[in-house]
Amino acid sequence: MEQFFWSYVWPALIMVGQSLLLLVCLLVAIAFLLLADRKVWAAVQLRRGPNVVGPFGLFQSFADLLKFILKEPVIPAGANKAVFLLAPLVAVTLALATYAVIPFADGWVVANINVGILYIFAISSLEVYGIIMGGWASNSKYPFLGALRSAAQMVSYEVSIGLVIVTVLLCVGSLNLTDIVLAQRTGLGTMMGLPASFLDWHWLSLFPMFIVFFISGLAETNRPPFDLPEAESELVAGHMVEYGSTPYMMFMLGEYAAIVLICCLTTILFLGGWLPIVDVWFLNWVPGIVWFALKGCMVFFMIALTKAFVPRYRYDQLMRLGWKVFLPLSLAMVVIVAFVLKLTGWAG
């Protein structure tokens, strides 16, 4: 019995504890990133943004959370109640489940599986079901139109994201996210005789794919300028029109969790993960989780600036960009990268 406990029960308890700790840290990070998003947008518009709740408005997101929890959920009369309430739960659960395989530093991962990137791609592809369920169950035309737009948009840009990931996998030769980060210790910089640095990361050697992945990530997470599913001027709020209180909060949490996931994946695939910008002794003292967080915040800042500066695309422009520009470009890059790797015999 004791052997059974230490062999099976204890590892399971450790994994549950790690998952709960990751969940708490992730929710706190999302709360402050949401505040940062609002602050950036306010600064661009020459406003102050949230500045009342707590010093510099730091507790605004927590006040909003409390407000949503204390509100009574209202279910439309013609809605399918079970599906209506299940939809936000599906959306937020799938969004949070992807973080199980994200390595925030060397060894800082809940489940270090060999097919981590495939797991993330599979789970994130299912997130559209939560949006479709919410749009259909609301029994209203605006949510349904928003859900249909979201399904078409996410499916269109998943193709480009998948091909971008294939180019990275060709260079690394592994589906393990930790291996993808460690492979970026050598690259174009070390080939030129320079010490390991940011010049070795994939953002330089795969720069077109870096741009495609970033823009496709915006479309995949319904962020401006690709926020067609919840366009306020057209569909009021898209699939979330009929939602309020806790279900609305869960949809928003799932949306921002997906945005943070794109920041994490961009950091891992193209920005060296937890690796320092230059491999020197005083930068190696900085914990890897700090480098990872700084790079992720930089990507999130770029996403926030895009929201503030770039106007919304029309639906036909969105589809044309995905199918007529990104898809051929991604396919061409897969062929070019494979040809170069075969010709040179180099990977890394």
Swiss-Prot record:
Record membrane topology: Multi-pass membrane protein
Annotated protein name in UniProt: NADH-quinone oxidoreductase subunit H
Provenance organism: Agrobacterium fabrum (strain C58 / ATCC 33970) (Agrobacterium tumefaciens (strain C58))
Function: NDH-1 shuttles electrons from NADH, via FMN and iron-sulfur (Fe-S) centers, to quinones in the respiratory chain. The immediate electron acceptor for the enzyme in this species is believed to be ubiquinone. Couples the redox reaction to proton translocation (for every two electrons transferred, four hydrogen ions are translocated across the cytoplasmic membrane), and thus conserves the redox energy in a proton gradient. This subunit may bind ubiquinone.
Annotated PANTHER family: NADH DEHYDROGENASE SUBUNIT 1, NADH-UBIQUINONE OXIDOREDUCTASE CHAIN 1
Any one GO CC term of the record: plasma membrane
Keywords: Cell inner membrane, Cell membrane, Membrane, NAD, Quinone, Translocase, Transmembrane, Transmembrane helix, Ubiquinone
Record field: catalytic activity: a quinone + NADH + 5 H(+)(in) = a quinol + NAD(+) + 4 H(+)(out)
The organism's taxonomic lineage, starting at the top: Bacteria, Pseudomonadati, Pseudomonadota, Alphaproteobacteria, Hyphomicrobiales
EC nos: 7.1.1.-
Cell location: Cell inner membrane
Family indicated by similarity: Belongs to the complex I subunit 1 family.
Database matches in NCBIfam families: PRK06076.1-2, PRK06076.1-6
HAMAP family, sorted: NDH1_NuoH
Spans through the membrane: 13-33, 50-70, 82-102, 115-135, 161-181, 198-218, 258-278, 285-305, 321-341
Superkingdom as given in the UniProt entry: Bacteria
Quaternary state and interactors: NDH-1 is composed of 14 different subunits. Subunits NuoA, H, J, K, L, M, N constitute the membrane sector of the complex.
GO MF term list: NADH dehydrogenase activity; oxidoreductase activity, acting on NAD(P)H, quinone or similar compound as acceptor; quinone binding
